[in-house]
UniProtKB/Swiss-Prot annotation:
Protein name as it appears in the record: Lysophospholipase 1
Post-translational modification comment from the UniProt entry: The GPI-like anchor contains a phosphoceramide lipid group.
Name of the gene encoding the protein in the UniProt record: plb1
Span of domain PLA2c: 47-594
Residue ranges the record assigns to the propeptide: 610-633
EC annotation from Swiss-Prot or TrEMBL: 3.1.1.5
Broad EC category: hydrolase
Amino acid sequence: MKTTTVACAVAGLLFSCVSGAPDPVHVEIQQRALPNAPDGYTPSTVGCPASRPTIRSAASLSPNETSWLETRRGKTTSAMKDFFNHVKIQDFDAAGYIDRHSSNSSDLPNIGIAVSGGGYRALMNGAGAIKAFDSRTPNSTSAGQLGGLLQSATYLSGLSGGSWLVGSIYINNFTTISALQTHQKGTVWQFQNSIFEGPDGGSIQILDSATYYRDISNAVSGKSDAGYPTSITDYWGRALSYQMINATNGGPSYTWSSIALTDAFQKAEMPMPLVVADGRYPGELLISSNATVYEFNPWEFGTFDPTVFGFAPLEYLGTKFNGGSVPSNESCVRGFDNVGFVMGTSSTLFNQFLLQINSTALPDWLKSVFTDILKDIGENDEDIAQYAPNPFYHFSNTTNPSAAELELDLVDGGEDLQNIPLHPLIQPERHVDVIFAVDSSADTTYSWPNGTALVATYERSLNSSGIANGTSFPAIPDQNTFVNKGLNTRPTFFGCNSSNTTGPSPLIVYLPNYPYTAYSNFSTFQPDYTEQERDSTILNGYDVVTMGNSTRDGNWSTCVGCAILSRSLERTNTNVPEICKQCFQRYCWDGSLNSTTPAGYEPVTILDSAASGIIPSISTVAMAVVFAAWTIF
């Protein structure tokens, strides 16, 4: 997530709200990802396989991804036919179109979904979007609904808070959002128990918290004692895991690479999950548009950027690669790619949560315990994740700024302002046609998005340094235009006319956070949420992507179908249906600008009234007063 007005954001820690939402369906979560790390959170030395791991060039997709895509295409083809059985396009048989072109998969739509950063706000708003897109959600396949879009997608990417959502879904059985919205104590997504408190274990909370801190400390100490550098990101990642993966012990043995070993993923029954982080070069403090953008997929860790242009086998992170191979006198390492550490890496800005321990209401003795845990961690390492040994050591020596470094430093995936994880989805090798970009960024004074993330990705594509490596992205207007023209108040399509882009580029369906039934603009740094706040924010996220169950536009689901088909219709030289032309007229950015400074952006709910995360009318002075009172307390 991005760094914006931290003082104001921290002040927002105080604001909570009570808002109504239907009870989620209670579904038992069954763990599917494999707890396959040899020694819990501690990376372990193992024998290398007969074919020793190597770093490969990013000139193509990996053989694993290529093979998986062949299987996934069959699943998405079937899912799209189901989707278009309830998403109707007037005077056009969309399901029949998919069926007629199913023998040539390159003709068919290729869909990506990207969930932005923004802390718990992004997780919950993004969860509402995924809930709306999931055909397993009750009533999501009714008229005007978008259920089945998730099943039709090839890729699902997350960044920072969005990575918590993606990780939580995939490690918990590619489960439904309804199942994660449990009301049972001691389970996942119990955000009323903050990171500082830990899960409710059924005892006195102080005792539960003491056990929680001790277990986190022991896990990180095990990694440190094994010779691996640790930072606050390790503690942050372990704490996250209790909320996102396993409330009992935080799932210390679950790895990101284990997703690729599960039967359901090998059968391509779900989209491919991708998590994004930024590289921080030696001696660098600020992350620029030239930063290398790394991805974690189920098989690999690496980047398409020309600086490194390589991928390492994820399962063997922690192994001492040198020049792209493992020296004959070195063993391999497994267990470094802990799920919590991966999610923590993508959200290192939230290390600030842990640094606020003295401002919490926890007993002094617990504060002292946790302060002792953190005392040996230098201030300069507060916001990084340390990947040592550096997998790209002496790899791409002429272009890789970290090639001579024994340690690779990674930071929050939104620190370069690209707060929507579009980077993996716009790579030409992946041939994505349309990206549904869910934006929960806190760009404005009151924590609403204004298109900054899209602007950053567009500007990067034009960067004269060549960091974009030939990737193309649709033209995006400036942030003032977003606000002045209301492009951040409703869905907007970018890249509708593919002939206007410099190269193959997906159509972007921009889905900005907006108050339909709840003020979902919570401060990025608010650490806890009532169950009502959680559920109402998820419900609002559902409304964001369905436009209030199509109440703002009765043809919205049809227009989504048109966006999905757009690039495919071009490839097959199929006439665009008249209703789709009307959709594009309504939702495509027309290229006009209004860059004058806008008035303050304070949207209000447009359906049922609700309480808010940050009340639009509250003044900055009032926020400062409350913040001062909180710090004194």
